[in-house]
């Protein structure tokens, strides 16, 4: 189904300056949050335990919280409903235990006065493992950005490659800061959301860059701004339909999904909006700011064609025994 029977060329680049200014302000605010407030590290990165408990009656959340607060070594315990009124999720930082102590048994003993229950899941991550996971998570984001830059450089040119990475860094910073704003623990779910966002956002950007290249190869115009406007306008229907589809799916996950996946669903929801916006207004504009020019492009293409023709001529001379 098409939203528009005829493609109307919209002047996206005319308004892109405002988009860049707004993005610059948002990124500065986001960096302020990241550096001065920082993330609240989840169990995956800081170490700790996660306990899933099911009661035969409605779970006494307040009573469970009070029971843990009485214990000196259980600091920063979080208790929340999980899926149903009978089930709760208990999170607490890493607790040092003696060799003959069983943390599972200690928790069960603390919960005894709260009623009939069953511990359905008990996961513990040590501080060393958490630190390794954090390092690997950061490394995976950096490697993803480098790999994308290399790929786009080979497929297009360095200006497009750098522009796409700038847009992706913009997306990652804004979405990462939203994790702080909405008080979500930084864990592997958030890293998974950021990596998914990188793949989703670059896909939109590549489609627009592909159409820009088609406009250039057709040589209908020698104006870079016009070529970009035509490329974005011709792919706008596809971009909006894809983005809205992803947006509504992730919105359902946010509203009806379990709290345990909020670290993935909420960053993805925000990332869908930010990624679509950056693909349209940020990446093409950055390419222009870096000096992308149709005249230079045609000159480079002409040099490539001339070089290829010279190689072909030399090959024929060599095969004919004249060299």
Curated annotation (Swiss-Prot):
The keyword Zinc-finger does not apply. Its main location: membrane. The keyword Thylakoid does not apply. The chain crosses the membrane at residues 19-39, 138-158, 162-182, 189-209, 244-264, 269-289. Gene3D superfamilies: Multidrug efflux transporter AcrB transmembrane domain. GO terms for cellular component: plasma membrane. One of its GO terms (molecular function) is protein-transporting ATPase activity. It comes from the Bacteria. One of its GO terms (biological process) is protein targeting. It is found in: Cell inner membrane. InterPro entries: SecD/SecF_arch_bac, SecD/SecF_bac, SecD/SecF_CS, SecD_SecF_C, SecD_SecF_C_bact, SecF_bac. Keywords: Cell inner membrane, Cell membrane, Membrane, Protein transport, Translocation, Transmembrane, Transmembrane helix, Transport. It is a multi-pass membrane protein. Part of the Sec protein translocase complex. Interacts with the SecYEG preprotein conducting channel. SecDF uses the proton motive force (PMF) to complete protein translocation after the ATP-dependent function of SecA. Belongs to the SecD/SecF family. SecF subfamily. Forms a complex with SecD. Part of the essential Sec protein translocation apparatus which comprises SecA, SecYEG and auxiliary proteins SecDF-YajC and YidC. This is Protein translocase subunit SecF. It comes from Helicobacter pylori (strain J99 / ATCC 700824). The lineage of its organism: Bacteria, Pseudomonadati, Campylobacterota, Epsilonproteobacteria, Campylobacterales.
